Amino acid sequence: MNDMQYAYIQNEKGIIDSFSETMNVPAGSWNDVESLALPHWIHTLKQLVIGCKCFGRALVFSIDGLGELERIVIRKECFVVTKNWIDIKNAPSDGTFRNAICPKLKFVHTGDYSFGDYHSFTLENLPSLYFLHMGYRCFFQCPSFSLTGWNPWSDIQCRTSLTPLCVVWLCRLCILSCCYI
């Protein structure tokens, strides 16, 4: 096997290689990691499942160009430094969520409070996406919300936190469950 065709990520939880179809991150892990940017060489990855309370310090979530990815499930309280409503409300928003160019991605689920202190949410060129679920207080502090490259509309954007108008636009496109108060 050519070294250029086989790559891997090794950590205390195991190995993810270029032939993995599923990546399961156990609850409470990877809390010292400052970003999650999955490399394009994980070209066979079909499913990403992140357990509760993971990536507590991560300020970047980026998935770009994973051609086989079909499903992303992120459980509650992930990618958020603060863990309760009062702290999230008062925390500076400084994280970035980006998911782009995953032509087979159909399902994205984010659990309660995940990404609560992120400032940017972008979904680009995800033509197969039909289910988007955002749990309670997800992306609560997010002033930049962008959805582009979906059919039949080519560009849907909201530049403030989710509003009823954004929810109406999104419900035409996919099933969206939001519980922002």
Short names for language-model regions:
Residues 25-31, 49-57, 65-68, 73-80, ...:
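Concave beta-strand-loop units of leucine-rich repeat
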Residues 83-84:
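A short, polar/proline- and glycine-enriched secondary-structure boundary/capping micro-motif
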Residues 170-173:
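Intrinsic disorder/low-complexity segments
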Residues 1-51:
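N-terminal segments that cap or nucleate solenoid repeat domains
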Residues 10-16, 35-41, 61-64, 88, ...:
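Leucine-rich repeat
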